[in-house]
Amino acid sequence: MTDESWPMVEEAVFRLFDELAAKDAGEHVAVGPRLAELGWSDIEAEYPIEACQLLFRAQGRSLAHTDCLDRVMVAELAALLDEPVDGIVLPDLVAGYTPGSDSDRVAGIVLGPLDGRLVVPVSGAMGAVSVGVIEADRLTGQRLDTFDPSAYWTQVSGPLDVALVDASTEWNRAIAAAHRALATELVALADQTLRIAVDHVKVRVQFGAPIGSFQSPRHALADASAVLEGARALLGESWRYGGRLSAQTAKAAAGRAHRAVADAALQVSGAIGLTAEHELHRYVTRGFQVDSLCGSYLQLEALLGERLFDIYAPGRPLPAIVTRAED
């Protein structure tokens, strides 16, 4: 594959996710078989970062519900797993990115219906994490009443009596991968939200002129766009250099940027933007829903602040968000 062929890959993936969103609206889709038809393993091998980014750009753009997040996190834990799994039990929303399960009991969230074999991360002493695998039919699940009504999330609980293996390092990598992936989806959702608002102010006429010609709407959208571009730049650095802290910061920035764009878009769109018939609310509610996974931007900002205060001392520099490898 050449760099010239990458736009064709993007087009194919965008088209696939648009089809999934249209055909399987409201359903949680295992996207692996459809990606295999595109030769995804070869694409991932040649463009590992760009391929992962593309999936979450496409998901945010299309509003499809897929198992992409499970795929990304399980890939970081794969070396510890003896057999293939179908998903992962994510931490409860109030727990941020700390697993809610312990050595005796499963507690957390599954994206989609409760089915198949699931990886269960388990919190231990001093921040340690271990993982086990359990059959979904041994757990109890209840569909959550989500802010985005199209999202299918399941609250799961049940006894845990399977073998556990230490996975502290692998779990940190999985959470960092999740933060980058979710941040990418949030930026894509914010892009679509901003596009809708800009299109609206171009055609909505008040006082004999498009409202986009007035200073207040222009400045509100420009300010939101600036916040979004800052988050996009930080996210790009996190993808480029990796690291847990940079991923956490990128997701916090992306969540805050989506909120800023949503606030501005709802303001300039007026009452029409709140109606079920208008598409704006779909990108707003989906963004709020996605932001809550693995730590909302408010939770992550609080954790980042606590870390800075814990390590601060007079004369000591702040920690680097991005650390470049030495040449």
Question: What do the predicted segments below correspond to?
Answer:
Residues 56-64, 78-83:
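Generic short alpha-helical segment signal, independent of protein family or function
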Residues 73-76, 275:
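Generic structural signal for helix capping and beta-alpha/helix-loop junctions
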Residues 1-62, 176-327:
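Alpha-helical interface subdomain recognition
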Residues 45-48, 66-73:
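Active-site nucleophile and cofactor-binding loops and adjacent substrate-binding regions
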Residues 69, 76-195, 315-327:
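FAD-binding core of flavoproteins
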